[in-house]
Every structure is written in C-alpha cells, then in structure tokens.
Amino acid sequence: MKSDSVEITTICPDVENSQFVVQSNCPETIPEILKSQNAAVNGSGIACQQRSLPRIKILGTGGTIASKAIDSSQTAGYHVDLTIQDLLDAIPDISKVCDIEYEQLCNVDSKDINEDILYKIYKGVSESLQAFDGIVITHGTDTLSETAFFIESTIDAGDVPIVFVGSMRPSTSVSADGPMNLYQAICIASNPKSRGRGVLVSLNDQISSGYYITKTNANSLDSFNVRQGYLGNFVNNEIHYYYPPVKPQGCHKFKLRVDGKHFKLPEVCILYAHQAFPPAIVNLVADKYDGIVLATMGAGSLPEEVNETCMKLSLPIVYSKRSMDGMVPIANVPKKGSKEDNLIASGYLSPEKSRILLQLCLAGNYTLEEIKHVFTGVYGG
C-alpha cells in the first residue's frame, strides 16, 4: 500500500449498516466524513463501528391485531387476547431492525377507546419522544383514524415518526395480516426517511397520513383510503416514499389541559341527516351537549327548517358530510349575517374528525371566530 493510500474493508455490501475498517498510513487523507461520532481511532487508522440500531417504543392498545378466534377461518366474533410480547413473538426478524421497548397501555376493542385511554396514548407518546427514534401504536381499525387524528392534533413530535398499525383479521386467521402490518410499521418508524412526516398509518403495504385517512370498508383487507393520496408503500422489505417529508397543511396543534389525573373533553355529538330529518332532534341534543356535528346530505345540504333551527341556537354546529369523500365549503353553510354565526363548515374533515377538532377547540375555550379559523386549515370555517 502506498504511503498516501487508503484501504477499506467491509463485511457486507450494505455500507449504511455494515461494519467496516479503514486503514491508512496517512490518517489525514481519510475523508472528513469518516471522522464522525460513529468512528473511533484504532491503531494506524480509523475503525468505523457498526451503527447502533434505532430505538423504537411500541404502545399497545388492543384491537383485531391482538385478537383470537375459535378457528382459523373465523373473521368475526373474535376477542382481544394477545399482548405486545405475543405480537412480537410472531415476527422474530424484527430484532435485526431495531431495539424495542413496549408498554401495554390497555387491551381493548377500539370501539371501547374513551377519553381516559386517549389520554394514556397521548401521555405514552409524549413521554417517549425524547428517548426513542420512533413510536408505533397498535390499535383497532374501527376508530384508528380518530385516535391518529387526535394525536396529530395534540402532539408536536418534531421529526420523530409516530406510526399507527392494526389489522383486519385476527391472529388466528389462516392468512392473518397483523404480523406483516406490525413488521412494516416498525420498519417505517425505524427508517430515517420517515422523519418529519407527522403521524403515519401503516396498513396493507400502504403508508398514509394519519390526519386524513378514513376507514372505508368494514371487512376488506384494503379497508382504509385517503383521497389526499398515499405517502408511500412497502415492497419486498423496502420503504418507498413518493414525496419528500411534509406534514398536513393547516393542522392546528392544541395544548391539552388536564385537571389532575382526570381528562375530560367537552361533549359533542354527531347527528346523521336523512330525508325528512326532523329539526326536533337538533333541539333535543342542543340542551345536553356543548357542540353538534351534522353529517349532512351532499356537501352541507339540510332541510330549510333544520337550518333555521340550527341558526337559532347559540352552540357551535359543524356541517360535515355523509359521503366518505368530498368537502363542505363555507359557501354551502347558512349564515345569520353577524359575528354570532354559529354554523361552521367542516371542509374536508369527516364527521368523526370534525367532532374531535370541535372538542379540542371547546376545551381550549376558543371563540366562534377562533373555531372557524381553525377549520379554515382544512378549507372549512
């Protein structure tokens, strides 16, 4: 070897993750990039140590992904029975991807997710951001989109990826989708390319934004959709992102206020409109709730007498839509013509996400004008 030559020996072609040794008679000729926090001087050269694995925190909440059925063909009527450790046992290869710590926050069907559990998830994520490179949350698919929206709206994670994952088939199914979904979610949370993208959802080989994703099929493996577009996919153990890192535009971040250990959000209900929808129902719930979300016909359509009833009330009422796709524009919402206009267009948000956004606004004591401004982030208001 010449006096100014450099020899690099590597144990595998994956330079990013392999261990390799650099030897040189003139260390000053070694590129500065090798003099990093992962490099240590060893003898006549520099030995770059193998990069440490990412640290991932898994928060378990239950759902179909943690469920068992009586036999292998049963895909309904199953029950939650598995812990995070049980799920990890089904994907032993994951130990090559990252170092994992986990916490079982609860083990329930996602229909039973309430405000106490929401706060546990919020607290679990908040307390893990500084110590881990990524966070994975196992969750039932029925209300996964609501929890993902809540977490995106209440936590500023910086660049740390937060990945929600679930499954449509129980663990005992002939072709259970849970193990692969979980494996992919952990890989996504571990990958540097996932940083700076906000809350993600990993299901059925697709990577989506947790802010906009919606469950559109009650039974199929391809049960979720996002009309704003998928962010990427997972193929043959590779993560492919279609766009550079970006977070949802107009996403308002709220600071939660907790009274001691008790977490309580204002009461907001959803009413589903239909032909001959009676205005009496609106009056009935107005006395018992802090706000109302209406799943309107079309893009904000309601019988005129219902509109008139809504405008007479003082509580905030959000006009959303029954359809899975589309939006309710401001122009389609009736107005009183004063600052006391209490009717709000949901924009692109579904009724269930509109409910959460309104709850967070009310919890923060926002005025009607401030609530409308928050909804302008999703082109409503």
From Swiss-Prot:
Pfam families: Asparaginase, Asparaginase_C. It catalyses: L-asparagine + H2O = L-aspartate + NH4(+). The modification Phosphoserine is found at residue 350. GO terms for molecular function: asparaginase activity. Its main location: cytoplasm. The keyword Signal does not apply. InterPro entries: AsnASE_II (IPR004550), Asp/glu_Ase-like_sf (IPR036152), Asparaginase/glutaminase-like (IPR006034), Asparaginase/glutaminase_AS1 (IPR020827), Asparaginase/glutaminase_AS2 (IPR027475), Asparaginase_C (IPR040919), L-asparaginase_C (IPR027473), L-asparaginase_N (IPR027474). SUPFAM superfamilies: Glutaminase/Asparaginase. It is found in: Cytoplasm. The active site is at 64 (o-isoaspartyl threonine intermediate). Residues 54-378 form the Asparaginase/glutaminase domain. GO terms for biological process: asparagine catabolic process. Induction: Expressed constitutively. Substrate binds at residues 110, 141-142. GO terms for cellular component: cytoplasm; periplasmic space. The keyword Hydrolase applies. Keywords: Cytoplasm, Hydrolase, Phosphoprotein. Homomer. Yeast contains two L-asparaginase isoenzymes: cytoplasmic L-asparaginase I, and cell wall L-asparaginase II. Belongs to the asparaginase 1 family. This is L-asparaginase 1.
